[in-house]
A protein has these predicted regions:
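Low-complexity, polar/charged sequence tracts that form flexible coils or short amphipathic helices
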Residues: 44, 63-66
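Short proline/glycine-enriched turn/loop motifs at strand-loop junctions of beta-rich domains
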Residues: 57, 66-70
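Non-catalytic extracellular/lumenal accessory regions of secreted precursors
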Residues: 12-59, 85-88, 93, 126-141
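Sec-dependent signal peptide recognition
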Residues: 2-10
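Noncatalytic accessory or regulatory domains flanking protease catalytic cores in secreted, cell-surface
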Residues: 54, 71-126
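Mature, folded catalytic cores of secreted/periplasmic enzymes
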Residues: 1, 39, 62, 105-106
Length: 141
């Protein structure tokens, strides 16, 4: 299977799962990936979904930072793209960061996960508006 097709299948599975909660622009959430979270079967990684209400044209930066695992982010929009924005290490080594201009108004799903199989541990998820904020502190795990 082509890599992007596998990603589309994974994201369709994720979109059917429960959301952990809602995060707004300007918010920070501290939580943990556990073995009780949603499992992305192709990668055997745990994941959480967070709902974000976005406006067309709004620029946001989404940061996922962890000292316990190599953070990975996906963003599913109201008009799901076959190539959704994703990131592994733009936040500095093992932290993930997405900065983008939202193409549509509606509910987005932020998928917080790891690039490592069965990884668990604490993380911080932050959504900011406007220009890209300063770089995250380097991962120290």
């Amino acid at each position: 299977m082509e890599p992007w097709r596998e990603l589309v299948v994974l994201l369709a599975l994720v979109a059917q799962g429960p959301t952990r909660g809602t995060i707004a622009v300007g918010d920070t959430v501290r939580d943990s990936l556990t073995r009780h979270d949603l499992v992305l079967p192709a990668e055997s990684t745990y994941a959480q979904q967070w709902r974000l209400r976005g406006r067309a044209g709004e620029t946001v930066t989404i940061d996922l930072a962890s000292t316990a695992f190599d953070a990975y982010l996906f963003l599913l929009g109201p008009n799901e793209s076959p190539h959704p924005p994703q990131d592994d290490d733009s936040g500095g080594r093992c932290n993930a960061r997405l900065t983008l201009r939202l193409p549509a108004t509606g509910d987005y799903l932020i998928v917080a996960t790891s690039s490592e199989r069965h990884a668990t541990g604490a993380f911080t998820l932050t959504v900011t508006a406007g220009p890209k904020p300063a770089a995250l502190a380097p991962c120290t795990r």
